[in-house]
Amino acid sequence: MNTFGTRLKFTSFGESHGVAVGCIIDGMPAGVKFDEEFLQNELDKRKGGSKFATPRKESDKAQVLSGVFEGYTTGHPIAIVVFNENAHSKDYDNLKDLFRPAHADFTYFYKYGIRDHRGGGRSSARESVARVAGGAVAAMLLREFDICVQSGVFGVGTFVSNLKEEEFDFEFAKKSEIFCLDPKLESDFKNEILNARNSKDSVGAAVFTKVSGMLIGLGEVLYDKLDSKLAHALMGINAVKAVEIGEGINASKMRGSCNNDALKDGKFLSNHSGGILGGISNGENLILKTYFKPTPSIFAKQESIDKFGNNLKFELKGRHDPCVGVRGSVVASAMVRLVLADCLLLNASANLNNLKNAYGLK
């Protein structure tokens, strides 16, 4: 499906080499200050064009078509479109019948019987423009509650930061070309990406996300837990293969006496749970890690088959990220913002007191 969310519904549209990509955000309350400069800044962070990303250069100028009047949301659907200006579709002519390894070509074709071979269509990282735009709008609502979502890269290939989570440097990441959270590893990360690119290959990456200013009570029990919603959102990003919350995999190696977050004087003494207990936020920082596979589009010679079953050897053309996880850090923040904004709105009717307060009743 192309729609995400329960109370705040986000729908993306468009293909990598189509006319445009964009989104519709439905359910945003009226009266939220709309920050168009922030929206554009988020899209600019996601843009390619550097030696650490795809050479494809797009202006990515957002056009807000509806849902905003005199600087504030109206409560009606917000439509945002970004036109594609620099697609080189001819680079993909030789792929019309070919299934690229590790891409969605094979599965899209056998599911739908038709696929857009130009840059991968909907399965392209280009679709993430819409996610970042939607996440920026969600952030405008979260600001009203002082909830802040930040992401950065803590691992590239075999190079992984050994800093403690509280030591990650988000201020440094804001200035880093690759959103690196560990200043001592930035050069290693960059070299790993460039080495992969120069050898006609690609490399994976690990992204850390922290949410501060969290409220208690976001998320539902059982099947709509906050952690399951976050995992759903992050796993829906192209190239993501794993998500951890709190201690994540490490929790399976621990004793309960170490993993439990004790309380004293009304405060948690640790945050192994990553800010979520029983599927509901406990007010501590949300801690998430998202793992991206290497970009499947590489320039080394590969083997595959075409839709007729013929064995083929081929070399790709086009413009591709040597490490899709770098720009993926911006997308991770966007998806987390969409989840939290949705949960925030759902929580307004979680109990009778909340509902009465919405109508000024006691």
From Swiss-Prot:
Keywords in alphabetical order: Amino-acid biosynthesis, Aromatic amino acid biosynthesis, FAD, Flavoprotein, FMN, Lyase, NADP
Pathway: Metabolic intermediate biosynthesis; chorismate biosynthesis; chorismate from D-erythrose 4-phosphate and phosphoenolpyruvate: step 7/7
Reaction(s) the record says it catalyses: 5-O-(1-carboxyvinyl)-3-phosphoshikimate = chorismate + phosphate
Cofactor: FMNH2
UniProt name for this protein: Chorismate synthase
Binding site for FMN: 122-124, 238-239, 278, 293-297, 319
GO BP term (any one): chorismate biosynthetic process
EC number: 4.2.3.5
Positions bound to NADP(+): 46
GO molecular function terms listed in the Swiss-Prot or TrEMBL record: chorismate synthase activity; FMN binding
Cofactor annotation remark: Reduced FMN (FMNH(2)).
Organism expressing this protein natively: Campylobacter jejuni subsp. jejuni serotype O:2 (strain ATCC 700819 / NCTC 11168)
Alphabetical list of Pfam families matching this protein: Chorismate_synt
Keyword ATP-binding assigned: no
Subunit structure: Homotetramer.
Superkingdom of source: Bacteria
Similarity remark: Belongs to the chorismate synthase family.
InterPro entries on file: Chorismate_synth, Chorismate_synth_AroC_sf, Chorismate_synthase_CS
